[in-house]
UniProtKB/Swiss-Prot annotation:
It comes from Buchnera aphidicola subsp. Schizaphis graminum (strain Sg). GO terms for molecular function: lipoyl(octanoyl) transferase activity. It is found in: Cytoplasm. HAMAP family: LipB (MF_00013). The gene is lipB. This is Octanoyltransferase. The record marks 139 as: Lowers pKa of active site Cys. Pathway: Protein modification; protein lipoylation via endogenous pathway; protein N(6)-(lipoyl)lysine from octanoyl-[acyl-carrier-protein]: step 1/2. Catalyzes the transfer of endogenously produced octanoic acid from octanoyl-acyl-carrier-protein onto the lipoyl domains of lipoate-dependent enzymes. Lipoyl-ACP can also act as a substrate although octanoyl-ACP is likely to be the physiological substrate. GO terms for biological process: protein modification process. One of its GO terms (cellular component) is cytoplasm. Its main location: cytoplasm. Its EC number is 2.3.1.181. It comes from the Bacteria.
């Protein structure tokens, strides 16, 4: 098994629970010969609550949430929203084999977003003690990971071209002061595919690997 290769898959628009189960199933059966993978996808509308979830982070009652489901999950972080037009990356990485820490991976993920946005002339930044990436002090990318037996699950989301309204129903990441933004507000011509191509290129550089589509491996 070549450790200089990470496989990627583009799943398109999927239900959250299906992909949650799929990544856990992948992690349960993987071994020292299993390639690391990064999954690209979007989710149908859903609110997910992480392990650090606090009370009173939903601003409206369920009748006003327009039937968007709310689920608790096993990633870090607090509440966020996923919906079509948001690029999600799940990182299924063997930390020990890559000789990196969870903090290293978080830094890589944040730099990935910053460098990708910079490629499109969108200047972004991080905030101390507030994981994620921001543009003009509005959040454009959220992070949330879990480590199980040295393997990572979950990952990041990047708002590209989506309806941001549901973020108004919650306090994103449990912070009443966070406002959300997306790529569309700075470049209305970019597509998810445009973003995905550069994400793969930057991932390859940051992880010093070849990012190869899974089904091209013989």
């Amino acid at each position: 098994m070549n450790n200089r290769i990470i496989l990627f898959q583009n799943f398109g628009l999927k239900h959250w629970i299906d992909m949650f189960n799929k990544m856990h199933a992948f992690t349960e059966v993987r071994n020292i010969n299993t390639y690391d993978e990064i999954w690209f996808l979007e989710h149908y509308p859903i609110f997910t609550q992480g392990l650090l979830q606090k009370i009173n982070t939903i601003t409206y009652n369920n009748d006003i949430l327009h039937d968007i489901p709310i689920v608790s999950t096993d990633r870090g972080g607090q509440i966020t929203y996923h919906g079509p037009g948001q690029q999600i990356l799940y990182f299924l990485i063997d930390l020990k084999r890559r000789k990196i820490t969870i903090r290293d991976l978080i830094n890589i993920m944040q730099n990935l977003i910053i460098e990708t946005l910079n490629y499109f002339s969108i200047k972004s930044h991080i905030k101390k003690n507030s994981p994620g990436v921001y543009v003009n002090n509005k959040k454009i990318s959220s992070l949330g990971l879990r480590v199980k037996k040295g393997f990572t699950l979950h990952g990041l989301s990047l708002n590209v071209d989506m309806d941001l309204t549901p973020f108004n129903y919650i306090y994103p990441c449990g912070d009443i002061n966070i406002k959300m933004t997306q790529v569309k507000e700075f470049n209305s011509f970019l597509t998810l595919n445009d973003i995905r191509v550069i994400l793969i290129k930057k991932l390859s550089q940051l992880l010093n690997v070849s990012i190869i589509e899974k089904f091209s491996i013989k």
